[in-house]
From Swiss-Prot:
Subcellular location as annotated: Cytoplasm, Cytosol
GO molecular function, a single term: nucleoside diphosphate kinase activity
Stretches the record annotates as Adenylate kinase 1: 58-258
PANTHER family given in the database record: NUCLEOTIDE KINASE
Family: Belongs to the adenylate kinase family.
Gene that produces this protein: ak8
Name by which UniProt lists this protein: Adenylate kinase 8
Reactions performed catalytically: AMP + ATP = 2 ADP; a 2'-deoxyribonucleoside 5'-diphosphate + ATP = a 2'-deoxyribonucleoside 5'-triphosphate + ADP; a ribonucleoside 5'-diphosphate + ATP = a ribonucleoside 5'-triphosphate + ADP
Length: 485
């Protein structure tokens, strides 16, 4: 970047690199870990931390009252995310840990394991290789705010806290139907999850503590403790109603666990809108520019401005514009580069529409260093596109635009003088649609993380969807489904 040249151009590669590799978040998390663990050799610790490459592995607490489905959700989540499933019981199953032996001695005496010891146990277990590399889902712990605070003091903090919830009467009815397989400890239910294998049915027994009175006592204890836990983890928690089919519950749990917390990293929006003609790209871009100060870059508009300003490039492309021909890509890219690399665009971000229209143009844009961090496809059926555009007319006197269905002319004399823009004839609209469909799939493959928005609804509803994806981080990518042998 040459500070002596005017106008000042900001190389786009710096911001793209920092955002693509999460440089800000890497440094922030590394400093957090150093301050929490306080290693004797912080330099080597940071090197090891970077080598582990485990900042994005799942770290999940799943809590809930009895019979809320904690075990089922934890198992499904671990299977889908390839994470380690932890419970207080299996944490105490180690036969080599001195801390486990100390905890077992309390249990042998019929005493509660102290919260401080629980925190050390969890810290020890979560420091093992499987939890570090694959992440973990901890079911049913912590149970109290004191335990949660002890975990925090030990440096154990979840990325997500899932709290399962349902009316007490539903939970009591569920709990009374619970059955346990005495051979492997698997949980079944007389109504919702009865095994088909007669051999398994014979192994099922009714667990202790599922009577209505005992379940009610456990529910009271849960309701007494959960407000404190929610206060402790207020920024990473979500309540999910489990009085619905369990796969619907799991879908909500998985969506939440894959979500990312809002980063403190500097974020400059670089937005690409594409879609069929008439999908509302220009309107959405103007709404974004109006609300957030993002620089609105319409490809067709900046080409016309270059011609009107009589720049050197404008003079070169003027014949193409006047004859309604496609401007060569290299000219378009040079003009767009001036806008995309301007100081205002680097400072406030940009929203681009009208370019690229195919993968060749997208590759040119990428080679120039301009990669969007949000790509939206405004989806609209061909019938709706043709209806929107072919019925659109303009009043040559006032310049006002009308539509035969959505905004008819107010008076008959206005209606009689309306004229149609030739590019909105049904034949030309269909030709533009054919060009769009010929390239849409390849463009989506090029950009991969394309966010599809249904554009056949109120434009402000569409804007709210777009806005929600801009102000929040994109969710984590879901790992491949494990294949059965």
């Amino acid at each position: 970047m040459d500070a002596t040249r005017k106008p000042l151009r900001i190389p786009p590669a710096m911001a793209v690199y920092a955002e693509e590799h999460g440089v800000f978040d890497i440094i922030q998390k590394m400093v957090e870990k150093v301050l929490v663990d306080r290693p004797e050799d912080p330099i080597q610790y940071m090197i090891d931390h970077l080598s582990n490459d485990n900042d994005d592995v799942p770290r999940v607490f799943i809590l809930g009252p009895p019979a809320s489905g904690k075990h089922t959700m934890a198992k499904l989540l671990c299977k889908r995310l390839n994470a380690t499933h932890l419970t207080p019981e299996n944490v105490l199953s180690s036969d080599v840990s001195l801390l486990v032996k100390e905890a077992q001695s309390y249990r042998d005496k019929g005493q509660e394991v102290p919260d401080e010891l629980w925190a050390k146990l969890m810290r020890e277990r979560l420091s093992q290789v499987d939890c570090i590399k694959r992440g973990w889902v901890l079911e049913g712990f912590p149970k109290t705010r004191d335990q949660a605070l002890m975990l925090q003091m030990a440096g154990v903090c979840p990325g997500h806290l899932v709290v399962l919830d349902a009316p007490d009467i539903v939970l009591i009815e569920r709990n009374m139907g619970k059955r346990i397989d005495i051979t492997d400890g698997e949980v079944y239910h007389t109504t919702f999850d009865w095994p088909s294998d007669p051999a398994v049915q014979r192994n099922l027994v009714e667990p202790e503590g599922i009577s209505e009175e005992e379940t009610g006592q456990r529910l009271l204890e849960f309701h007494r403790n959960i407000p404190g836990l929610l206060r402790t983890y207020s920024k990473v928690s979500k309540k999910i109603n489990v009085d619905q089919p369990y796969m619907d519950v799991f879908s909500q749990v998985l969506t939440f666990v894959l979500s990312k917390q809002r980063s403190l990293a500097p974020h400059t929006p670089r937005i690409l809108l594409y879609g069929p003609p008439g999908s509302g790209r220009s309107l959405q871009a103007s709404l974004l520019a109006q609300k957030y100060g993002i620089i609105n870059i319409c490809c067709g508009q900046v080409l016309k401005e270059a011609v009107a300003d009589q720049t050197k490039l404008g003079e070169l492309i003027q014949p193409y514009i006047e004859n309604d021909q496609q401007v060569p890509d290299n000219f378009v890219l040079k003009i767009l580069t001036d806008h995309l690399s301007s100081l205002e665009s680097a400072k406030h971000g940009w929203v681009l529409h009208g370019f690229p229209q195919d993968t060749d143009q997208a590759a040119l844009l990428k080679d120039a260093g301009f990669m969007p961090n949000r790509v939206f496809s405004l989806d609209l059926s061909d019938d709706v596109v043709i209806e929107r555009l072919s019925l659109c007319m303009t009043d040559p006197v006032s310049g006002e635009r009308y539509h035969s269905i959505y905004k008819p002319a107010p008076r008959s004399e206005v209606q009689e003088r309306l004229q149609q823009n030739p590019k909105y004839s049904e034949e030309k609209v269909q030709a533009r649609l054919d060009v769009y469909h010929a390239n849409a799939d390849e463009l989506e493959e090029f950009y991969q993380d394309v966010i599809h928005i249904n554009a056949d609804q109120d434009p402000y509803t569409v804007f709210e969807f777009i806005e929600s994806y801009i102000v929040s981080p994109l969710p984590k990518s879901l790992p491949e489904e494990p294949t059965s042998p």
